[in-house]
C-alpha cells in the first residue's frame, strides 16, 4: 500500500491531466502558497504533469488550478520542440503595431512557484490572448509591458527576475489564474457575455 501524498488527493499520479474549462467554478478558487514541507517528489510530479498537459493541448502556459490543483504553481514554455518549424506567432502587440514571433528551438520550460510581481511597469501593451480553459476564444487584453517577479524553483530556492514582452504577458496571465481570474474577466461585461455566448455556440457545434 502506497503512502498518501503529503499534498493530498489533488496529486494523484498521471501524465496528461484534464484541463478545467469555463464555467467550472474551481477556476475561481484563489490558490494557496506551496509551503516548505510541500517541496519534494509530489511537487515535481505535478510540474511534470503540467508540462505534459500543456504541450499536449498545446499551449504556452498553464497554472496548477487549471488542472484542479489550487496551489501557486505555474509553468511556461514559449518555444515549440521542432527545430525545423517556422517562427511561432504568439500574439499581436496593438500598442506598438507588430507581431511577436519566436524562432522555433528546443523546449525552454520555466517553472514559477509562489510567484509575486514586485513592480509592474506603468506602460501597457495590448495582446490578443487566449486560454486553455477558454478554448478557441481570443480577446485583446492590456497588461504592463514589463514586470519583475520573485518566485521559487522546484528546490525551494528564491529568485528575482525582470521579464518583458510575451514572457511578461504570459506570466501575468497565468498569475491571474492563481487569483481565480480569467483573461475574459478583464473584458467589459458586454464583451464577456458575447465571448461566453460564442463559446457555448462552439461547444454545441462540436
Can you describe what each PLM-predicted range is?
Residues 6-172, 177-206:
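Active-site rim/adjacent substrate-binding subdomains
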Amino acid at each position: 500500500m502506497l503512502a498518501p501524498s503529503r499534498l493530498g488527493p489533488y496529486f494523484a499520479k498521471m501524465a496528461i491531466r484534464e484541463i478545467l474549462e469555463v464555467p467550472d467554478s474551481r477556476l475561481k478558487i484563489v490558490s494557496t502558497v506551496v509551503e516548505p514541507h510541500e517541496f519534494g517528489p509530489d511537487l515535481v510530479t505535478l510540474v511534470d504533469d503540467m508540462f505534459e498537459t500543456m504541450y499536449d493541448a498545446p499551449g504556452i502556459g498553464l497554472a496548477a488550478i487549471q488542472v484542479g490543483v489550487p496551489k501557486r504553481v505555474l509553468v511556461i514554455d514559449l518555444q515549440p520542440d521542432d527545430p525545423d518549424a517556422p517562427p511561432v506567432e504568439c500574439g499581436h502587440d496593438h500598442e506598438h503595431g507588430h507581431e511577436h514571433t519566436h524562432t522555433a528551438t528546443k523546449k525552454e520550460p520555466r517553472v514559477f512557484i509562489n510567484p509575486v510581481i514586485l513592480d509592474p511597469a506603468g506602460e501597457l501593451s495590448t495582446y490578443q490572448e487566449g486560454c486553455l480553459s477558454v478554448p478557441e476564444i481570443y480577446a485583446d487584453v492590456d497588461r504592463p509591458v514589463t514586470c519583475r517577479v520573485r518566485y521559487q524553483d522546484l528546490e525551494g530556492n528564491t529568485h528575482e527576475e525582470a521579464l518583458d514582452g510575451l514572457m511578461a504577458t504570459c506570466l501575468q496571465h497565468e498569475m491571474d489564474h492563481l487569483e481565480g481570474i480569467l483573461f475574459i474577466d478583464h473584458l467589459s461585461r458586454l464583451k464577456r457575455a458575447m465571448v461566453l455566448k460564442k463559446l457555448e455556440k462552439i461547444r454545441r457545434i462540436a
